């Protein structure tokens, strides 16, 4: 009887563990120019479970790439990152973000120009907002600039819409362009 109870308890623990682990994942959303590049740079960080290219910040529901790139929807190309905070902190994701954008350029990023390529950190809650502001202040200090010189916008998270399938994992699916 004890052996059966122990076996049953072990099975229940094994079955419930992945659900608990999945429930502990957190989400961050970053816009920083072309989502292909941002997705590629963030998804390989230890502790990041997945990164999805998409759109955030605009008014239109279920926007398409064509609509967003027309610069009429208010959306930015963005990446939604699901991460394990026991393996990588939101602050570490922010440090990676700042290394992958030009924080002094609010008109797009690098060769990608326009509102849909504007750098934005979308914050999900007060803790993320405080961490994002602290990271912006640190980035400004590191650059020797006043905080007001940074053009990365910090905004409350808007609805995130995944981009079309051909945009997902673009760097891996087009390795000739990304090696």
Q: In which residue ranges do the predicted regions lie?
A:
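Flexible coil/turn and secondary-structure edge motifs
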Residues: 22-179
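Bacterial N-terminal signal peptides
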Residues: 5-16
């Amino acid at each position: 009887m004890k052996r059966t109870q122990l076996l049953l308890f072990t099975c229940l623990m094994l079955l419930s563990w992945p659900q608990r682990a999945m429930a502990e994942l957190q989400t961050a959303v970053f816009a920083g120019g072309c989502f292909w590049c941002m997705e590629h740079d963030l998804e390989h960080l230890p502790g990041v479970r997945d990164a999805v290219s998409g759109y955030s910040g605009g008014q239109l529901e279920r926007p398409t790439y064509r609509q967003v790139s027309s610069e009429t929807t208010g959306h930015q190309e963005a990446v939604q990152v699901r991460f394990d905070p026991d393996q990588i902190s939101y602050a570490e994701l922010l440090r990676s973000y700042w290394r992958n954008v030009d924080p002094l350029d609010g008109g797009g990023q690098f060769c990608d120009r326009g509102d849909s390529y504007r750098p934005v950190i979308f914050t999900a809650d007060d803790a993320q907002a405080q961490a994002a502001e602290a990271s912006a202040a640190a980035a400004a200090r590191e650059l020797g600039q006043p905080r007001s010189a940074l053009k990365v916008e910090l905004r409350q998270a808007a609805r995130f819409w995944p981009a079309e399938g051909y945009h997902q994992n673009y760097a891996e699916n087009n390795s000739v362009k990304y090696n």
